[in-house]
Amino acid sequence: MWLREAQTAFNAYIRARDGNWCISSQRIIPGQTQAGHFYTTAARPDLRFNEDNCHSQSVTDNQHKSGNINEYRPALIEKIGLERVEELEVVGRSDWNIDEIIAIRDEYKVKLKNLNTK
């Protein structure tokens, strides 16, 4: 439950931060975008809440093209730089305790609120 709530808050922040711009196809997507992880949460749970690893993405790219990684990586390098992309390749921690998850959830609720009030 806590992890799902934290993920929901994080994803909402990512979508608000990036708007309707799909990082993979490099175009505005009318309608709903998703928070697409460059490294999936299954493959790299340590990057689940890493803002450099997650960006707005079309449903087609995120769900039907496995993230469209061939297009995602060059766009990610352009957006955050090669050094930060390479930092994502270093494996880190993969588990959080409940207090940390609640703190993550609360942090992204505040970030989303602040983003929406600008």
Language-model segments: which ranges?
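Short cysteine-rich loop/turn motifs with clustered Cys
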Residues: 6-34, 58
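Short, surface-exposed acidic
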Residues: 80-90
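Short edge-strand/loop segments of extracellular domains
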Residues: 40, 79-80
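Short beta-strand-alpha-helix junction that forms the catalytic/metal-binding core
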Residues: 21-22, 44-67
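Short Cys/His-rich "knuckle" micro-motifs
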Residues: 32-38, 66-71
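Short Cys/His-rich Zn2+-coordinating modules
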Residues: 1-12, 38-44
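A boundary/linker detector
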Residues: 1-9, 88-118
